[in-house]
Swiss-Prot record:
SASP are bound to spore DNA. They are double-stranded DNA-binding proteins that cause DNA to change to an a-like conformation. They protect the DNA backbone from chemical and enzymatic cleavage and are thus involved in dormant spore's high resistance to UV light. This is Small, acid-soluble spore protein D. The gene is sspD. The record marks 22-23 as: Cleavage. One of its GO terms (biological process) is sporulation resulting in formation of a cellular spore. It comes from Bacillus subtilis (strain 168).
Amino acid sequence: MASRNKLVVPGVEQALDQFKLEVAQEFGVNLGSDTVARANGSVGGEMTKRLVQQAQSQLNGTTK
């Protein structure tokens, strides 16, 4: 099934893929179809958590 997610910032896909690989490596997860959904989902959840924290920091005028 095709993904319906649209990226707000054009050209950011490569950076998100790199970010996903970094988080997966930290968690010890090998991304792919042979990995259980729970492990793949944990990577996506952590990415979301970090991106929200980064956005909140930027809105508050602080940077990490």
